[in-house]
Amino acid sequence: MTCCFSCLNPRTKDIRVDIDNARCNSRYQTDSSVHGSDTTGTESISGILVNGKVNSPIPGGGARSFTFKELAAATRNFREVNLLGEGGFGRVYKGRLDSGQVVAIKQLNPDGLQGNREFIVEVLMLSLLHHPNLVTLIGYCTSGDQRLLVYEYMPMGSLEDHLFDLESNQEPLSWNTRMKIAVGAARGIEYLHCTANPPVIYRDLKSANILLDKEFSPKLSDFGLAKLGPVGDRTHVSTRVMGTYGYCAPEYAMSGKLTVKSDIYCFGVVLLELITGRKAIDLGQKQGEQNLVTWSRPYLKDQKKFGHLVDPSLRGKYPRRCLNYAIAIIAMCLNEEAHYRPFIGDIVVALEYLAAQSRSHEARNVSSPSPEISRTPRRDL
């Protein structure tokens, strides 16, 4: 199937490798070479322009500094009952601040995958960038060797919690909810690529990093690997390869040349996960089907086989025409030649059109509504 965006109502345990030096910014002139770490571990990312204005971290204006004692009290001394999740980076706890605000507190493992540089990059990035589809950083803690990040609490967890290994009593996401999540995630990337100046390359887009609020509106999280994109005559940023296996664009994995089109490939993988309900890498699948992109390639090329890609949990309740559009978008995002992949602005237009068509289809079929039911948010303290 072929499709052009101009037809769609156009408008104007994760595996990571070591992080390199973040891009230093002096009027956006950059030396991307790696010469080892500096003595402070500080990343210079100030001076990002948003809507023509310089955004910079202002003391007292944005993310606040917490003491370790405050965060220990918020989590009741990091009790297991408040544990939301854990990984190679450390643990995430649910907490309640003195103000009564419920938050998510990420306590980094000093020996984990997220190092001091990544911590600083994340604090700076989320202090500079603000959008409805980016998670809000409330504050941080740097007491002694402790490194903690305090985020707004997202009651429905991550996208992967609702796509993979569902509990027997857990209702699968409806088609329309999946499209809503796709549109929101794309808008978040569009903000990073098109509004921030220079553009920000997310570099770690995956279902685990897409958090969901109570209305299933998505927010991108975990900006420790984000990097400022190329400016001027530069076409790419050269960097050590990093990210998550199964999501990385092939040209980036091979050469370390990073562009905004690297994020587009990652987005294609996430969109494929949304359609199929399968993980980017699933060692539980039989040989030849463990890599989602590799497994899907033959089906993406044959419209008659598109149905084989659809998550069985949808039970056939999706508009066939909208599926065709979605797979066309996926195929373009996953093009092995980076310059043939669409820009995120075009993807947003296409997905907004697709989501609108999906809603119209549902409205015409109100006699057989989606099996979507209300879901129970994560437990309170």
UniProtKB/Swiss-Prot annotation:
One of its GO terms (molecular function) is protein serine kinase activity. It is a lipid-anchor. A lipid is attached at C3 (S-palmitoyl cysteine). It comes from the Eukaryota. Its EC number is 2.7.11.1. May be involved in plant defense signaling. This is Probable serine/threonine-protein kinase PBL21.
